[in-house]
Amino acid sequence: MTQSENVAAAGGAKTEPKVRPAKALQGVKGMNDMLPADAPLWEHFENAARAMLRAYGYQQIRTPIVEHTQLFVRGIGEVTDIVEKEMYSFTDSLNGEQLTLRPEGTAAAVRATIEHNLLYDGPKRLWYTGPMFRHERPQRGRYRQFHQLGAEALGFAGPDVDAEIILMCQRLWDDLGLVGVRLELNSLGQAHERAAHREQLIKYLEGFQDILDDDSKRRLYTNPLRVLDTKNPALQEMAANAPKLIDFLGEESLAHFEGVQRLLKANNIPFKINPRLVRGLDYYNLTVFEWITDKLGAQGTIAGGGRYDPLIAQMGGKPAPACGWAMGIERIIELIREEGVVPDAAGCDVYLVHQGEAAAQQAMIAAERLRDAGLDVVLHASPDGKGGSFKSQMKRADTSGAAYAVIIGDDEVAAGVVQVKELRQREQAEGGGQQATVPAEGLVDYLIDAMVGASE
């Protein structure tokens, strides 16, 4: 006899199997959600950035998140950390192509410039923003999915544009109210100058093989410049005394670097020359720079860039000079929080309270008319679909951040009026601002006049 038959024979009811709740799924480690509470701060940064980029005449470009892997191998450099161990790459099961989630934005912007012949009528100033992906250990300020803002000045050779892209960053820091962000500067010269320096640098580093860490040993003969960028405390003295690339620069490279410095000084931009600053990508030449803060711990670089004149030709385009920068948006958002310059979250203009079937219909009509006039309106809706009391709705209106509550009940519908209550006049007596009865047809004009008056 089965268990259910035993239960039935005993006169008991059949027991339904206990259903376990499904386990909640979570996001991928290092790939974070941006929640509604964070949105105003992101929008604040994005609005400031867009305004700055417009002020300098930059145009937006958007490229795919997925590119051919070879784009980054050729563009970033085969022996860089990004290409060797940080890229999310996969084989397309449909056609066998090797594809990669973009780890940075410059290579794709240059690819698009070449593919669409954007330089046919002269130099271009372009900017981009979006998510990038690197397979690394997540920590504060370093994520597997992160967001970049970048600017690329393509077709410009002079030190004036190097200086201008640095000034752009300073203007953004000023607009965001950020202080204590310092600029470090260096020149990587040209390829033949780096080759002469590389030869001497390898000879120097070979004398320290007994203390080099694994990363430095791996880079010794493939990318020795990156050894100078080591964060290992035991190697700092060695790196500080290494041959300096700036001592190998010829007249033209030195003149370019001095031109950049002269323009920065003329615009009152303080900077420090850091001969060990090399950046982590192989496409740079001449000017390189980083903006650094001490308020974010080890991940203190919030923006960096420089000149990359060889890259366009290296990727198959007609040779053209170029320079640019990229900044990590998450790190800047964190710095804004650290410095306490977070803007107040903006509420909507109107919260529409209603009770009764006829009132609900009129409230929706009124909300659409207000939106037609350019106002931001939240129309009350309750979780249970029953509306809720006027008291509970007014609490929602107050916590929404709205400047005004518009109140409609069936009595107001019958009389052809609405009630308008000020919610943000804190100098008024406790309980909020004034309340007025307004003809329904005149609601839009009344609120616009009231809001204009409040802003004067």
Curated annotation (Swiss-Prot):
Cellular localisation: Cytoplasm
Assigned keywords, A-Z: Aminoacyl-tRNA synthetase, ATP-binding, Cytoplasm, Ligase, Nucleotide-binding, Protein biosynthesis
Main location: cytoplasm
Enzyme class: ligase
GO MF entries: ATP binding; histidine-tRNA ligase activity
UniProt region (Disordered), positions on chain: 1-20
EC number(s) from the headed UniProt entry: 6.1.1.21
InterPro entries in the cross-refs: aa-tRNA-synth_II, aa-tRNA-synth_II/BPL/LPL, Anticodon-bd, Anticodon-bd_dom_sf, His-tRNA-ligase, HisRS-like_core, HisRS/HisZ, HisRS_anticodon
Catalytic activity line of the entry: tRNA(His) + L-histidine + ATP = L-histidyl-tRNA(His) + AMP + diphosphate + H(+)
Pfam families (UniProt xref): HGTP_anticodon (PF03129), tRNA-synt_His (PF13393)
GO terms (BP aspect): histidyl-tRNA aminoacylation
GO cellular component, as recorded: cytoplasm
Binding partners and assembly: Homodimer.
Protein family membership: Belongs to the class-II aminoacyl-tRNA synthetase family.
Protein name (Swiss-Prot/TrEMBL): Histidine--tRNA ligase
Organism: Cupriavidus necator (strain ATCC 17699 / DSM 428 / KCTC 22496 / NCIMB 10442 / H16 / Stanier 337)
Gene responsible for this protein: hisS
